[in-house]
């Protein structure tokens, strides 16, 4: 439901209903706001507990960004820059059915950057926990950032569908993730 709107801002609210309570038995109000500020879009989530019992939830964004952007056939040579990092980032992957695999893996970086090679996304998803960075940029083949996602979440994921040469990369800030295999 539209909550408020100005020329630069818009906000929506989702509240629990009898139908939502069938699958998610909690009373809540989810407020999502968008603000245009020069060449940025700022997104704000507020999860409000409208009950007296504890509210369990996870929330995350699912933005996808065009890649490649200059008419190339694939993403090879494009890349990512992880703000504030230099040599490595720790991550883990997931199973084909979406379960997290908690085996610690290290992605080598050069000056905080990694370049996409053929098969880079064959692991499907790079899940990064522990607030290792709060900024991820997509880089074109010249190493120039063309989109940057800034966030203050405990984890994020970067992925593109494996083996499909999909024309996008997702950079997803998350509060919570899928369950893990053991």
Question: What do these predicted regions represent?
Answer:
Residues 54-56, 64-151:
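Active-site/ligand-binding surface loops and adjacent short beta/alpha elements
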Residues 1-38:
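Extended, loop-rich substrate-binding clefts of extracytoplasmic carbohydrate-active enzymes
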Residues 18-19, 85-89, 98-100, 169-182:
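Surface-exposed, gly/pro-biased binding rims or lids
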Residues 145-182:
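Active-site pocket scaffolds in enzymes
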Residues 10-12, 30-32, 43, 59, ...:
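Hydrophobic residues positioned within well-ordered beta-strands of beta-sheet architectures
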Residues 42-44, 62-64, 168-174:
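Active-site scaffold segments
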Residues 34, 41-49:
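Short, well-ordered beta-strand segments enriched in hydrophobic/aromatic residues
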Residues 24-27, 57-59, 162:
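Short glycine/proline-enriched turns and hinge-like loops at secondary-structure junctions
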């Amino acid at each position: 439901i539209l909550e408020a709107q100005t020329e630069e801002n818009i906000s929506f609210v989702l509240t629990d209903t009898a139908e939502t309570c069938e699958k998610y038995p909690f009373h809540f109000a989810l407020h999502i706001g968008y603000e245009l500020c020069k060449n940025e879009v700022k997104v704000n989530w507020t999860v409000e507990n409208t009950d007296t019992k504890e509210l369990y939830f996870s929330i995350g964004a699912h933005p996808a960004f065009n890649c490649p952007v200059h008419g190339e056939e694939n993403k090879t040579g494009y890349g990512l820059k992880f703000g504030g990092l230099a040599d490595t980032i720790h991550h883990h992957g997931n199973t084909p059915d979406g379960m997290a695999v908690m085996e610690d893996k290290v992605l080598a970086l050069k000056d905080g950057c990694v370049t996409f090679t053929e098969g880079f996304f064959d692991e499907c998803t790079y899940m990064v926990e522990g607030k290792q960075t709060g900024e991820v940029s997509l880089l074109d083949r010249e190493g120039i950032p063309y989109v940057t996602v800034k966030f203050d979440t405990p984890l994020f994921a970067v992925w593109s569908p494996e083996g499909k040469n999909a024309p996008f990369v997702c950079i997803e800030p998350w509060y919570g993730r899928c369950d893990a295999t053991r």
